[in-house]
């Protein structure tokens, strides 16, 4: 049995000239990246540059969607309906996917960020909404989740899962 470790980091978390972390340093050591999709952090220019850098280095690109909460960095409960969660996820996946395709790669996984990432573990309606979005968008995407409702829903639907 061969063991493989996938080192992943959250990247593209900035706005305009402001950057959250040292993405260039992380790009030198990671094999996968969770890329902010514009709702908690990231903007079109940052998403484009991050997708390009990942494609150039052969780093697997993943979506890091969140609640539409820039001020709270995606860490606040927004009181969204399940339909809003589904639609927000589809919107963010589409945005990152466009940049990935522009650089000859594709989105490979999705890892919900912040409060969304916490709530999909305990709220079945949010877990179903995320799974619905993934099935509608690309059911080959690996779901990165904590053990809980989203992981259970991914298993029920036969979606690829990493915990």
Where are the regions a protein language model picked out?
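Catalytic beta/alpha-barrel core
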Residues: 35-40, 119-120, 137-148
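Glycine/small-residue-rich loop that forms an oxyanion/phosphate-binding "nest" at active or ligand-binding sites
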Residues: 70-112
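Acidic (Asp/Glu)-rich catalytic clusters
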Residues: 24-28, 49-62, 101-104
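A short alpha/beta connector and helix-capping loop motif
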Residues: 15-48
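Hydrophobic faces of well-ordered beta-strands that scaffold small-molecule active sites
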Residues: 5-9, 33-35, 61-65, 108-112, ...
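N-terminal basic/disordered segments at the start of proteins
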Residues: 5-19
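Active-site rim beta-loop-alpha module in soluble metabolic enzymes
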Residues: 148-163
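Charged helix-capping and loop-helix junction motifs
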Residues: 123-129
């Amino acid at each position: 049995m061969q063991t493989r470790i996938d080192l992943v980091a959250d990247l593209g978390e900035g706005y305009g000239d402001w950057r959250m972390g040292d993405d260039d340093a992380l790009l030198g050591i990671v094999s996968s990246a969770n890329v902010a999709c514009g709702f908690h952090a990231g903007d079109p220019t940052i998403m484009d540059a991050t997708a390009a850098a990942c494609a150039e280095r052969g780093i697997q690109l993943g979506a890091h969607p969140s609640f539409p909460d820039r001020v709270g960095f995606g860490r606040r409960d927004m009181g969204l309906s399940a339909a809003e969660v589904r639609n927000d996820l589809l919107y963010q996946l589409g945005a990152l996917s466009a940049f990935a395709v522009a650089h000859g790669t594709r989105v490979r996984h999705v890892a919900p960020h912040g409060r969304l990432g916490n709530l999909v573990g305990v709220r079945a309606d949010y877990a179903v909404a995320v799974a619905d979005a993934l099935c509608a968008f690309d059911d080959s995407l690996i779901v990165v989740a904590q053990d809980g409702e989203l992981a259970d829903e991914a298993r029920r639907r036969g979606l690829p899962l990493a915990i």
